Structure formats: structure tokens, C-alpha cells
Amino acid sequence: EFAKYIDGMKVVYDTVSNELKSLLDRGEFPFVIAGDHCSAGGTIKGIQRAFPDAKLGVVWIDAHADLHTPYTTPSGNLHGMPLSTALGVENVEMVRNDVDYETKEYWESLKSNYLLPENLVFVGVRDTEAEEDYLISKFNIKNYKVDEVLSKGVGQILFEIEEKLLHCDLIYVSFDVDSMDPDESSYGTGTPVKNGIQVKDAEDLLIGLLEMPKTAVFEMVEINPCLDNKVNRMAEISFSLIKKISLLNRFQ
């Protein structure tokens, strides 16, 4: 009830983390394209297994904070929880749900406790619940809201992110397409939120982040053509972003 399909998600976490570790052990650059954002917890677990002693920096570009737990979730949807598994938080101060034993056991198995909150940066987050706001405030997690991206410009945002994560050994960039403004892009994603990042800013942001030498893993999630109000526009935009990223010198 408070963590829907968590048994299946355990399989996804294990599968993704195994593949990520294998790629990183071979010196490859993992490029993850996923549906539901909850698989990101498995991505982080894979990074942890490959680099257990490394300091990981995470740039989370998303309309949502994804900081819920089974104890705080209003929906039970695991795609709202992957960062909590990486941070290893319960958010006991904001508990609203009485979670059963089996769910607790599965939840503990998903947690990696690898990411430190000071090494997490949000970009574009604009749809959160009180329980998530509490953690953002408690840990003083930086969120570059859309208006700040517009006012400062992508170049300045990139400079500040690189400075903030300077002490990290590697960086993981997770891009949810719902971070973009659905009226400009499309509604071809599971949980679109208005007033998002402009497509060109998203492109410049991703190219800048992927050019950073410490960036070791990239992920793009939540493309859903079945929900697209412009035929297949979201997938087309996403493919264009992927193509431009793939042309960077580091991938030649």
C-alpha cells in the first residue's frame, strides 16, 4: 500500500546495479535510459558497488524531489522515493503511514546510504510535498528553481554546480524529462508539471554537465509516448538531446 510493487522494484534495483557495476568496472560511461525514475536508486547502488569509497555528487534535474519514503508517501509510488534510498533516510519526523514488516524489510534492502545530502543538487524541482520540503530544509539541499535558471543563466548555474561538487570524486546526472516545461515540450511523461525548464536551457545544461570531467554516469527517464499530446514530441526532443550529447568529444 505504501510502497507499490516494491518486490518487483527490488529486482529492478539489483538488475540495474549489477549492470552499472559491470560497465564502470570496464571503464565504460553508462548511459541509462529508463521509464520510471525509481530505477535511479539501482543506478546509484551500482555506482556504490563500483566505487565504494568515492564521494558521489548527484545533479537531479526533475520537477519532483523524489524524497518520499514508505513512511511519508501520500501515493505509495516508488518513483517518488529513489533519492531517499540513496540517502538512507526514513524521515521519521514526518511519518504519516504505518508500514508493515515486509515492506520495511524490502525498503531496507533498497537503501544504499551512499549519497550525502550536501552532495546533492536539484535543478527545476517545483512540485513537492511538505515531507520532502522538510528534508530539503533540514539538509539545506540546493534547488536551482526555474526562475533562478532563467535569471542567472545556464552558464552561471553550471559554474556553481561544479564549484559545489568540487570535492566529489565523481558526478552522476539524472535527467527526468518532466523537468522541462510541458507546454513547450509535451505532456509525454508520467507526471508533467507546468512552468518548467525551457528545452534549450535543458540542452545547454546537459551538455555542460556531461562535459565536466568528473561526470561518470548519465540517465534520462520518464519518456512516455502513450501520454504524449503531440504525437511523439517528447521522444523526439529526448532523442535530439541524446544525439547532441553523444557528439561531445569525450564520446568520440
Where are these regions (language model features)?
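Conserved alpha-helical scaffold segments that buttress catalytic/binding sites
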Residues: 1-252
